[in-house]
A protein has these predicted regions:
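SDR active-site strand-loop-helix element
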Residues: 7, 33, 70-74, 110-116, ...
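N-terminal Rossmann NAD(P)H-binding glycine-rich loop of SDR-like oxidoreductase domains
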Residues: 4-24
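Glycine-rich NAD(P)-binding loop of the Rossmann-fold in SDR/ketoreductase-type enzymes
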Residues: 50-53, 83, 87-98, 134, ...
């Protein structure tokens, strides 16, 4: 990777990945874009406002900036996707299709993340294997499975260098998430410090896979730098770090903050989503 375009740089992953890539490849070689202004990203390197649903704008950007690698991070997350399923499809798949087409036209490598949300209730719950039944019950999951298949199609049909991992919930001390089912695993730490109490929106006994953000960023770079001839899978690799429940986090925080309390106000949508996902990935 020499000239990198990040599409959706203002989100949870993109905001930190931009900084991470700039440290490795140089500030001027990582072009960040988002549909909204991102002052912090603009201060450290090239940033432009761009709507990922505008195919012509993306093509012009790649051509003008001489991009060789694209990171498409545009997504409406799981809970938001259930509230706005049509919008989620239009945004998630629209941005991906534009990225794939531009990558095909300009011979770019393309990274676009999948998720544990690609699995569903009929997938094995524990140590979910790489290749298994994938019948998600959320629009977010449907988009992720579709994205994996489109990535495979563009690689086999057009030779596009597509790559992807299935991210679990991502835990960051830098950027707050928004609209996801695993958000509680970040919010609980902030509330523990801010107010000493937390109201959890998912049941206390539900396991979900999680990963610390710096590990996720490193995985992105290692995959994109890997020898393409040695990649068994392209869309998409399982990637795992840890699996826990809200009660497990609560107990660990209590060891540091004995006065910390947690209660529950379970969101039925998030509950259904969480219970449809794997407990752990293989």
């Amino acid at each position: 990777m020499k000239r990198i375009l990040i599409v959706g740089a203002g989100g949870q992953i993109g905001s930190e990945l931009t900084t991470y890539l700039r440290k490795i490849y140089g500030n001027d070689n990582v072009v960040a874009t988002d549909v909204r202004e991102c002052k912090q990203l603009a201060e450290s390197g090239p940033f432009e406002v761009m709507n990922a649903l505008d195919a012509n704008a993306m093509a012009e950007m790649v051509s003008r900036q001489k991009i060789d690698s694209i990171f498409n991070l545009v997504a409406l997350l799981s809970a938001v996707g259930e509230a706005k399923p049509q919008t989620a499809w239009q945004v998630n798949i629209g941005a991906l299709m534009n990225s794939l087409e531009v990558a095909r036209q300009y011979n770019c490598a393309l990274f676009t993340p999948s998720s544990i949300g690609a699995f569903g209730p009929s997938s094995p719950k524990d140590k979910t294997p790489q290749d298994t039944v994938m019948r998600p019950t959320t629009m977010y999951g449907v988009c992720k499975v579709t994205g994996e298949m489109l990535g495979d199609y563009y690689h086999s049909r057009f030779g596009v260098d597509t790559r992807s991992v299935r991210f679990p919930g991502l835990i960051s001390n830098v950027t707050l998430p928004g609209g996801g089912t695993t958000d509680y695993a970040v919010e609980i730490y902030y509330e523990a410090i801010r107010s000493g109490r937390f109201t959890c929106p998912v049941p206390g006994d539900v396991y979900m896979d999680m990963m610390y953000m710096p590990d996720a960023l490193r995985a992105c770079v290692e995959l994109m730098e890997a020898d393409p001839t040695k990649l068994v899978h392209r869309n998409s690799f399982n990637i795992a770090s840890m699996s826990f429940t809200p009660e497990i986090i609560y107990a660990e925080i209590k060891k540091r903050l004995p006065d910390f309390t947690m209660d529950y106000d379970v969101d039925p949508v998030k509950k259904a989503i969480a219970e449809s996902w794997p407990n752990s990935l293989d």
